[in-house]
Amino acid sequence: MKPNYFVAYLTANDTPFFHIDYFNWMNMFKHHPGVDHIHLYVAISMVQQFSFFQRKLIEAMMQATAKCKWITLEAVILKPNQGRDFSSLRECLIAMKGLAVDNDFILVRNRSSRGPFKSQWYKKYINQFQSHDNTGLVGSTINLVDHNERGLKANVSHVQSYSFLSTWKHLSALLDNFPGMMASTHLEAVIDGEIELSQRILRSGAHISSLQKPEMILDLDSQNDPVQSQYPAVVAFQDIPIVHRKREPRGLQFWIKRLGYFKLLTFLVNRKLKVKFMDLNRR
């Protein structure tokens, strides 16, 4: 059976204008993903009270999905900030229940990511996922060391969570006690969320890998082999569809494109798409 394709986009309302999210969304709507159709779920952690103005901004930004042939907006989820991106992902997965099945793909990205800047962006993650048997998680990049404030020397390899792809089979298995779902600090989000997510996948018997080092395939045992640190980064950052914000090129074109944010004014006036908000703060 042909799989479905999902995107879970995770952000927060600690900045008033969602300008980074706007450019990320417009890039997804502009560049063809290389798959037939994507179901988009957006989760917004409420760092502060969600204002009427912010609701209207999100509604305006999502108007572009009405014209995008390959993305359907399924829901915008408003949720408490506890658990940060990891509780956000969990809520997106809960919302996908009933539609997603085991072999469906789920691409997860947060506000620290940038892109995509080229077409075939979703397909590239799938290609890496399918290039080796028993894959459970594929990221843009991968890290072999622990957070320096904890400093463990083993069992800490992890896909960096600003952008990664997995399947419903692997992610739904984590729902009952999702990694990082109770995190309240950045350190807890890294250790209990980002690192633990990969470690749970590895403990299930599956493998993790990345687009940057496609031949470095880690399992529970090989993650601690010193030879892994010798794998070169054979894929340049400009060839990775979704990169960390620190890797985004900032030349003249970067600043010219920033002016495109003002196109949002037309979406504010011409709203045709009804956005469905799921406000979990009212439960």
Where are these regions (language model features)?
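ER/Golgi luminal nucleotide-sugar-dependent glycosyltransferases, focusing on the catalytic module
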Residues: 1-283
